[in-house]
């Protein structure tokens, strides 16, 4: 835990500070679907400058609020990537939240549980429970945080994109206690080089193995191949992907096609090159996808009450 604190302070002081706090996702750390086990969470800042957090079993939500005079009322929950093995918590988490807050969008970094048979009764739903809890938490605290509860979206990178798209296609069934019947449907999704499908030849085998296990049934693979779960209630979506990504751009193509087929609004930024894991800025392009997403949000989510 000492290493985590040091790295957290490093990140905190390295960036301009908006109103922010890290809070337990579940009250009193009463985490559902959990097995009592030692807290082995570990954070490490690699030589490549990437902050990686592993073995997360106690999820948190970090809150980044814009100044009231800049607030748009929009909110986004950010799910870092990492193959359901680690969380790339800096360039796909805190850095992104800071940038959204600068642009007037309240941002929330979700440090979600990483699937483990050692800490979860059913590891396949653990991350989804955390995403649903984050949506519930933001909506139920919308007044305090100066947020319109009808402008709460979710953003995910890579495997975090799989989690975000799972939240956007599996919201009909609550995996958490929801006594107030708060809507668990995100109002929009932003999916950046996402894993969408677990079909062979499209999906990311590492993410599938970490979430579903070594030999998942076809039923389970289909359930979490989110292009197969789209319906008329699926939220509007923005997709960002590079054509040379090792997580095949076919993930985004197939999701885009199904969304269009179902009449769901979808917009895209597809780069000719850029690879995987570039975060907010693709150094091989002059296009800033954050600018594109900001314009998309203003166009489609500004006039809500």
Question: Which residue stretches match the model-derived regions?
Answer:
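Short beta-strand element of the alpha/beta-hydrolase
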Residues: 72-81
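Short amphipathic alpha-helix adjacent to the substrate-entry channel of hydrolases
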Residues: 90-108
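Conserved alpha/beta-hydrolase "acid-adjacent" motif
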Residues: 246-251
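C-terminal catalytic histidine-bearing segment of alpha/beta-hydrolase fold enzymes
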Residues: 253-305
């Amino acid at each position: 835990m000492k290493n985590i604190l040091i790295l957290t302070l490093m990140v905190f002081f390295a960036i301009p500070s908006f109103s922010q706090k890290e809070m337990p996702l579940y009250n009193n750390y009463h985490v559902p679907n959990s097995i009592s086990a030692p807290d082995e969470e570990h954070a490490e800042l690699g030589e490549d400058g990437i902050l990686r957090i592993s073995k997360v079993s106690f999820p948190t939500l970090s809150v980044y609020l814009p100044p009231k005079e800049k607030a748009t009322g929009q909110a986004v929950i950010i799910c870092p990537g990492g193959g359901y093995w680690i969380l790339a918590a800096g360039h796909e988490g805190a850095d992104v939240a800071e940038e959204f807050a600068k642009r007037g969008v309240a941002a929330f970094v979700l440090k979600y549980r990483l699937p483990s048979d050692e800490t979860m009764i059913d590891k396949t739903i653990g991350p989804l429970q955390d995403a649903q809890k984050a949506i519930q938490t933001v909506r139920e605290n919308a007044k305090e945080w100066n947020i319109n509860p009808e402008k709460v979206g979710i953003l995910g990178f890579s495997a975090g994109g799989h989690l975000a798209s799972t939240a956007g296609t599996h919201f009909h069934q609550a995996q958490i206690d929801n006594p107030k019947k708060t809507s668990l449907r995100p109002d929009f999704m932003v999916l950046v080089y996402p894993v969408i499908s677990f079909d062979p030849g499209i999906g990311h085998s590492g993410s599938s193995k970490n979430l579903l296990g070594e030999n998942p049934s076809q039923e389970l693979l289909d359930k979490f191949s989110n292009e197969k779960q789209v319906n008329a209630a699926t939220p509007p979506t923005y997709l960002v992907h590079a054509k040379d990504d090792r997580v095949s751009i076919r993930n985004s193509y197939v999701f885009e096609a199904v969304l269009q087929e179902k009449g769901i609004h979808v917009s895209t930024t597809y780069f000719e090159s850029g690879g995987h894991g570039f975060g907010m800025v693709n150094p091989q392009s002059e296009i800033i996808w954050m600018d594109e997403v900001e314009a998309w949000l203003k166009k489609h989510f500004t006039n809500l009450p």
